[in-house]
């Protein structure tokens, strides 16, 4: 979503700088520092990458932006981070923050944009002036109510939920790394990795084939982001950017999880399916 808008702005004559990432999906603050200019007006950095789970240094980046480019507003796509981290936008120096309801068990199609009161935004939709003039059109009251309830609920027992997610992630990585010819992608350090996402490459098996084989057994995983699911792209742009080996680009799946029983069921099926699928892939 952010990338397409940046490409659009580039077409309109704006100068846009795209920062590289390392092999775990993280940006370098030094690269950001070098890219900032006095006339920079907007910086957007993903809080958590939705494919490999890299948690970007958002607070440090925001501090750099406000210090070195005082005219710039700082935006973060927090769709994979909201509910998983305690985000305080003003304290973190975040001017704009995007959230999507379905990631916190809210109604699909709902979401919100946090806007610092200092930021003045022109509406894209004109009309009746609903939502304080920011988005005209009849309010989706059930969606708003559901999103509000989900937002209130997702931070209840936060520490306990975090501990559970971290334990599940660590357990899954420990077990999946016992399988032959696999590679776990993204940061290894807990503080740099989201607790709910694990990216795994399975050498010798196409991701689409493994995805459907798991699907037939009631296990639902992803081979890319929802943002790119409607685009006929040969491989994920994210996986290319982290310089994944060419033979792994089309052999990578993203896992999220709920409980240990589901993980055990998934791991059992991976152990059973991988040798069979690799055998057929060689023929």
Question: What residue ranges belong to the model's regions?
Answer:
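Pyridoxal 5′-phosphate
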Residues: 1-283
């Amino acid at each position: 979503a952010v990338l397409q808008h940046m490409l659009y702005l580039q077409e309109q004559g704006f100068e846009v700088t795209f920062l590289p990432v390392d092999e775990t999906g993280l940006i370098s603050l030094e690269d950001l520092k070098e890219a900032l200019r006095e006339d920079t007006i907007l910086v957007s950095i993903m809080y958590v990458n939705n494919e490999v789970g890299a948690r970007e240094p958002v607070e440090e980046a925001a501090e750099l932006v406000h210090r070195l480019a005082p005219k710039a507003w700082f935006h973060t796509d927090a769709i994979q981070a909201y509910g998983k981290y305690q985000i305080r936008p003003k304290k973190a120096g975040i001017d704009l923050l995007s959230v999507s309801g379905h990631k916190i068990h809210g109604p699909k199609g709902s979401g919100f944009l946090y806007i610092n009161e200092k930021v003045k935004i022109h509406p894209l939709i004109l009309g009746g002036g609903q939502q304080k003039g920011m988005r005209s059109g009849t309010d989706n009251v059930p969606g708003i109510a559901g999103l509000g309830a989900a937002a209130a609920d997702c931070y209840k027992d936060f520490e306990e939920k975090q501990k559970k997610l971290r334990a599940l992630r660590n357990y899954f990585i420990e077990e999946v790394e016992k399988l032959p010819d696999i590679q776990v992608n993204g940061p290894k350090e807990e503080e740099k990795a989201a607790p709910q996402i694990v990216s795994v490459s399975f050498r010798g098996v196409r991701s689409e084939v493994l995805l459907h084989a798991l699907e037939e057994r009631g296990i639902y995983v992803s081979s890319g982001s929802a943002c790119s699911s409607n685009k006929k792209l040969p491989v994920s742009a994210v996986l290319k950017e982290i310089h994944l080996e060419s033979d792994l680009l089309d052999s990578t799946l993203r896992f999220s999880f709920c409980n240990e029983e589901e993980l055990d069921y998934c791991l059992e099926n991976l152990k059973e399916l991988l040798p069979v699928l690799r055998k057929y892939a060689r023929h």
